[in-house]
């Protein structure tokens, strides 16, 4: 361990430089090109081979192994949520680093770009090839499209893979959860009676939907949860809301529980208010294989495609 710490201290300045260079480039989902080009540039500076940015803005590079009989994938998502400041500054202090999305996922990208230099400092040569990937279009409606595209187009069979997340650097998770993420939208119909006194608009029916979803029984084993993370609707306190949208996510260690959870949320949506059209769109994430304990669940999520269900 002392040897590793000494080597890490030698590349500390490079790591922080990579953090600032990469993290200060805005990269909201679907707009990662500039950040991807910077990551590819840092890969090249670290001596990696085949440093490229593909048409979906994935930045990848190859660290050749001494034998090269197998290939490992080391990936980190490159996109972020939209930022209020289009030019985020990262402040580096003696004991902390402060800035937008440093923890999601700039630290991991900096670690990815610095790893080849650290291995060189430690005089470690891996037998296997390692492909380093900064994946685009991972969050929200990105639906892991960047990773899916890379895996489909690379033509390389990967024996194993690791995903780097800034908040969990130093922690190894060997299991994965299936996920369904979606939206429910209540809209006023075209023939809505605006003259009706006491018109409720769409917020009250959405509140009924949220109440019903919160009462859906979910098991603790396998671990299952329904997260209702966002609600958006209305333009002012004095106007009836024409449209209200709920963003939710169903997570489970078992597809047999996450799929009924998604169906149950849609069912409550359809029963809440006959005058409101409710639409649901879902998208899935987490493709993968050979993962314990939920391999079949992850494959199921990867196969699932967007769908919608409407009712009046």
Predicted segments with their positions:
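Acidic/His- and Gly-rich active-site-bordering loop/insert found
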Residues: 1-98, 118
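Metal-dependent amide/peptide-bond hydrolase catalytic core
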Residues: 1-4, 10, 24, 50, ...
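Predominant activation on well-ordered alpha-helical scaffold segments within soluble catalytic domains
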Residues: 16-20, 37-40, 109-117, 148-152, ...
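Short, conserved micro-motifs enriched in small and acidic residues
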Residues: 30, 98-110, 197-203
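Acidic/histidine-rich catalytic neighborhood of metal-dependent amide-processing enzymes
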Residues: 33, 101-179
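Acidic-glycine-rich active-site phosphate/pyrophosphate-binding loop
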Residues: 78-92, 158, 175-185
């Amino acid at each position: 361990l002392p040897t590793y710490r000494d080597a890490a201290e030698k590349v500390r300045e490079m790591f922080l430089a990579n953090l600032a260079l990469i993290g200060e480039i805005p990269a909201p989902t679907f707009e990662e090109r500039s950040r991807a080009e910077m990551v590819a540039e840092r890969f090249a500076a670290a001596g990696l081979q085949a440093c490229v940015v593909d048409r979906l803005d994935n930045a990848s590079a190859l660290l050749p192994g001494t034998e090269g009989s197998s290939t490992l994938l080391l990936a980190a998502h490159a996109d972020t949520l939209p930022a209020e400041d289009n030019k985020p500054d990262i402040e580096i202090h003696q004991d902390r680093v402060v800035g937008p999305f440093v923890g999601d996922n700039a630290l991991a990208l900096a670690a990815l770009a610095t790893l080849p230099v650290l291995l060189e400092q430690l005089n470690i040569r891996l037998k296997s090839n390692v492909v380093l990937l900064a994946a685009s279009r991972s969050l929200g409606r990105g639906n892991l499209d960047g990773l899916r595209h890379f895996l489909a187009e690379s033509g390389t069979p990967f024996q194993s893979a690791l995903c780097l997340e800034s908040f969990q650097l130093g922690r190894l998770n060997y299991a994965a959860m299936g996920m369904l993420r979606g939206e429910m939208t209540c809209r006023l119909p075209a023939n809505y009676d605006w003259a009706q006194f006491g018109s409720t608009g769409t917020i009250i029916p959405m509140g009924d939907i949220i109440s019903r979803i919160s009462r859906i029984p979910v098991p603790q084993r396998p671990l299952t949860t329904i997260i209702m993370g966002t609600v958006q609707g209305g333009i002012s306190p004095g106007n009836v809301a024409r449209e209200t949208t709920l963003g939710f996510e169903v997570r489970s260690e078992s597809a047999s529980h996450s799929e009924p959870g998604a169906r149950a949320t849609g069912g409550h949506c359809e029963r809440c208010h006959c005058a409101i059209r409710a639409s649901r769109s879902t998208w899935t994430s987490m493709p993968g294989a050979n993962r314990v304990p939920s391999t079949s669940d992850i494959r199921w999520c990867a196969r699932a495609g967007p769908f919608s269900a409407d009712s009046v």
